[in-house]
């Protein structure tokens, strides 16, 4: 539902978007590109599951990961900046979190950090879901990101 509304708003506002996903594993990009005409607004995406990919491809600082962890608002923000620049998009969206069966970096299962950068304005989000099912968490995370992105676009229109 949100993907259709987002597609309409992006085209109306003539904005392009790029995604950098870790925890959602490409589902966010899939949702955004499942709409006819996606090439009018979707520049590209990266699934940066590995920390070295975050560092080498998205220019996340190794010190950010060392000091705050890959699952952090700091890492999500740097991923969003990196993907926005790499794909020359108006909007960069990035997410990192823990969907699976065990806590990582002393952070709970169901924890999501994401950042949406529109133009020069960054919006940082943190959510915690109460699901212990990996697939459910990934879907919930993706829906939360799409819902938040739609809300921000609505404020622009």
Swiss-Prot record:
It holds the Pfam family CinA. It comes from the Bacteria. InterPro entries: CinA-like_C, CinA_C. Belongs to the CinA family. This is Protein MG115.
